[in-house]
Amino acid sequence: MGKTVEINPTTRHEGHTKLVLKVDDDGIVEKGNYLSVTPVRGFEKFLVGKPAEFAPIAVSRFCGICPIAHATSAVEAIEDACGIVPPKDGLLLRELTGLGNKMHSHPLHEFLIAPDFIPEKDRVEYITRIQQMRKTGQYIVDTIGGEAIHAPNIKVGGMLKSITPSAVSKIYYKCKEFEKLAKEQVEYLIPIFENRTLVDGTEIPEKLGYHDFGYLATDSTYGNRENIEQKKVHEYTPYDVYEKEVAVQACQLFQEYNGRLMEVGPRARFAKFHDFKEKGAMAIHIARAYENVIHVKRAMEIIEELNVDGLTRAKDPILGDGEKLGLGVHEAARGHNTHQASIDEKGRITYYNAIVATTWNIPLIGKAVEAHYKFAEHVVRAYDPCVSCATQHDILRL
């Protein structure tokens, strides 16, 4: 006869979500619904009418984990709307700040999954390594961005200022340390994920989290608006996806690209740019571990290329025509992140919209949990959802 199983809240990720699962008599999920129940804040609406420079300040408050991704997408959307081209060294500093954020965020996720996969005897060493990695990521953001969480140096037109040669040397040294730790983390974690066994001895089904949807990523490490056709992005509401009694609880929109659900994040980037073929929940963990190494290598490349005496910010006026829709694209830790903005001739925001990484993955997670319901939260955690970022709209149907 079957039943409905509700897991509320789901745990060890950012924000508040629930799973509403229709399962058969054997506990196998026949229909999975994953939804945000995080209260709506409505950032996009209260940004309208504000000066353009306020956008990166505001959107970096979406959450405390992804602030750099949103500030970066915001300034790039405004720059696109106003025809502003930041100087090379400003863009390099901005990219390095974003890498620092990911070098903090990915290890944080690996901390959150420790109770699932890491034997108690290994946890002190494992968590110590993670905290050292996170410290480096935060140091990069703090040094370049001006603050480790809400970085004030990310400005429309580039970056507020450069860094000193001494800071460059310190960042490079810390990146070398991070690279060593990241490689140790890969050597430790990959066999665990490939073994598909939880710390209590439970074997994870080989095809847990398998799906046949697409992958969306615009760049291996940063973001590129030229690699996405925005006209193919379609947003729709929970009422288009869930049954009414479920939809009325949901606090997020959804997206399709060219009529198809798309996964974003580490595995999507690996599939697009590194010919990664693995599927399932464990493959996302594997891709994320490898990305730590890729991120720090790119960070060191930027340090080699950066001219600390170069111009960091364009001086163009932040003025638009009120019509052109600017597009800011950034590959956040959790995946493809887009902000859209229109700016009028007085430099004020006339339209703002954020299409956040986790909103791409939420409907896909609901479909990917279709195994035994006791494994559903492991699928959720594999995607490392950041639900506060994904909860900016409310839909009311009377």
Swiss-Prot record:
What does it catalyze? oxidized coenzyme F420-(gamma-L-Glu)(n) + H2 + H(+) = reduced coenzyme F420-(gamma-L-Glu)(n)
Q: Which UniProt keywords apply?
A: FAD, Flavoprotein, Metal-binding, Nickel, Oxidoreductase
Residues at which Ni(2+) binds: C63, C66, C386, C389
Q: Which cofactor does it need?
A: Ni(2+); iron-sulfur cluster; FAD
Q: Which SUPFAM superfamilies match?
A: HydB/Nqo4-like
Broadest EC class?
A: oxidoreductase
Q: Where are the transmembrane segments?
A: none
EC number per UniProt? 1.12.98.1
| GO molecular function terms listed in the Swiss-Prot or TrEMBL record | coenzyme F420 hydrogenase activity; ferredoxin hydrogenase activity; flavin adenine dinucleotide binding; iron-sulfur cluster binding; nickel cation binding
Which InterPro entries does the entry mention?
Coenz_F420_hydrogenase_asu, Ni-dep_hyd_lsu, Ni-dep_hyd_lsu_Ni_BS, NiFe-Hase_large
Query: What protein family is recorded?
Result: Belongs to the [NiFe]/[NiFeSe] hydrogenase large subunit family.
Known partners and oligomeric status? Complex of alpha, beta and gamma subunits.
Function of the molecule: Reduces the physiological low-potential two-electron acceptor coenzyme F420, and the artificial one-electron acceptor methylviologen.
Q: What is the protein's given name? A: Coenzyme F420 hydrogenase subunit alpha
Natural source organism: Methanococcus voltae
